[in-house]
């Protein structure tokens, strides 16, 4: 966990991406974490994973620092519902489970996600996808709760 935490706090997502996509950095990570298969798998997954997921993970990591567990679960529910409707979810299922070619064609690059329009797209995933008053976890949070801007 500590290597991931250090990485997430080491700069912006573009900086992290440059590091994780670098072959030299990958060799260094493999040396530093030779005994840590979890970290190695996390880096490999990042390098081949969906850029929208990377941007969402980075944003979520930084949004939840001061939220309660109830607020985090509420927010993650919002993100999960939006992700299920995301074209990249379908593409990932196709590439991994249906065609099994392991060659997904993601809808956006990381550079797209970091643009103003891309950030707006990422931010949409945090909004309440349910009609007012129908969020399954809505009763957990009051309107004055920290993080209530995510409660709609």
Where are these regions (language model features)?
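C-terminal alpha-helix plus adjacent terminal tail
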Residues: 1-152
């Amino acid at each position: 966990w500590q290597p991931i935490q250090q990485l997430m706090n080491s700069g912006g997502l573009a900086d992290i991406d440059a590091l994780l996509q670098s072959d030299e950095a990958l060799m260094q990570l493999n040396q530093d974490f030779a005994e840590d298969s979890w970290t190695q798998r996390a880096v490999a997954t990042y390098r081949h994973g969906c850029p929208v997921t990377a941007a969402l993970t980075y944003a979520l990591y930084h949004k939840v620092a001061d939220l309660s567990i109830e607020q985090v679960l509420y927010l993650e529910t919002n993100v999960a519902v939006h992700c299920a409707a995301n074209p990249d979810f379908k593409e990932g299922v196709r590439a991994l489970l249906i065609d099994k070619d392991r060659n997904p064609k993601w809808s956006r690059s990381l550079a797209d996600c970091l643009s103003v329009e891309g950030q707006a797209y990422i931010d949409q995933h945090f909004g309440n996808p349910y009609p007012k008053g129908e969020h399954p976890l809505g009763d957990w949070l009051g309107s004055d709760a920290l993080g209530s801007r995510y409660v709609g």
